[in-house]
Structure formats: structure tokens, C-alpha cells
Amino acid sequence: DKGLYDSSAANKKAQDMQRRIAMIREHMPVLSVSIHQNSYHDAGVHGPQVFYYESSVEGKKLAEAVQSSLNDLLEVDRPRKVKGNTSYYLLKRSSGTLVIVECGFLTNPEEAQKLQTKEYQEKVAAAVSEGIRTYLNAQ
């Protein structure tokens, strides 16, 4: 729960994203998963969703594996599908396989409450981990 920005930074979000990319470039991992929480103007919207860079074949495969695990292990009533994207900073700037996992919507009161519990956080982590294993085992 710690941002990768200086407390005095004028734009904390931008600095956080830049530092995430710098870490990825420095360590050159096989894959990267960036964990986030979503928001939307409609408080009824809920559920985890995984994003990948639209032209990344491997990113899409990883996103689908993680999304499937999230939908199954969290018993999502209306499962979301992965979404390709070309405008998110992390997806545009990463040279490797990277997905963004939006664990849920903080603007949905029920989901926001669940996201704050250790039990649910561990379920989300287990689902993401299972999705990564599924992706790697298919390689």
C-alpha cells in the first residue's frame, strides 16, 4: 500500500507510473502485473477487470488467464472480460508483457467494503497468482 512517489511530488500519480516503468526496465521481468483499484461514476458497476496493451499477443493471453481466475475464484456474478487498451501509460511504456489488474470498484460501496478486508485481498491475490501460473504453464 505504498505509492512509488515522493511525498513532495507535484503529480504523485505520474511519478508513481514513471517509477513503475523504470523498475520494469531495470529488472526486465518475464511479465509484470500492476495492481490497482477502479472507480466509475455509476456506483452499481463492480467486479475485477484486467487490461492489456491492445497489440500484445502475450499480454492478452496473460490478461485472459488472470481474468478467468479472478472471475472463478471470486465467484463474480457478472464476469467482466479483458480489455485491450492503447492509452494507459503503463501499457504504452512497457516493453514486456504487462497487464493491469483492477481488483474492483471503490465507487461500489459493497465492493469497496470487501476490498478492505484481508480475507478478500488474499482471495484476489490467490486468483491473480493462479492466473499467472496458468499463463506460464501454457508457455
Predicted feature locations:
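Charged/polar, solvent-exposed surface patches and flexible loops
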Residues: 19, 68, 72, 113
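Active-site-adjacent mobile loop/cap segments within catalytic or ligand-binding domains
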Residues: 22, 27, 34, 41-42, ...
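Short, low-complexity, polar/charged sequence segments that are solvent-exposed and flexible
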Residues: 51-54, 69-72, 118-122
